[in-house]
């Protein structure tokens, strides 16, 4: 495989590393890993208390980039639970569901190789109104994520779309910002209701391995 090469996010990653040096985050924390919907979750530390949270979402990122920077902003933290949300940007840029599933599978492999007790809370893609033409491919990716979770007890798949949709499957008008892409405050509140139970279960599952 060719070495990962991207300079697009160098400043973001360098900023994370500077923050880590100035204020080293705890080992065995809850880690947010993925794209901007995680990065922009302003109330996350409060919403997921009392778990220590490290948010390493970076805007516009694809699974290639999250994988590429794993050695710098995922693995060094030895996280206890990772909430992973990425893949929608890949598909929006023309990538296939199969390619996204393969990269998420590789992310899981590398995470567990470095940190055998880590748990993964794998969020679905977001079928946002502005990306309607890509929904079918996103749903294929989600089915792959669901299958990955079914094959690995340490992965919990969470489909966030039902929480963001009306009963007929159309997006709720109140859960997205004006860009029809990123979650609003109401959107994050809806997501929290389905993500928090999975995080609680994952944290509990690692109690013995992460006892001080």
Locate the predicted segments by residue.
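Alpha-helical cap/lid subdomain in secreted, periplasmic
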Residues: 46-51, 68-211
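Polar low-complexity intrinsically disordered regions
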Residues: 1, 211-212
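Serine-esterase "nucleophile elbow" of acetyl-processing enzymes
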Residues: 1-78
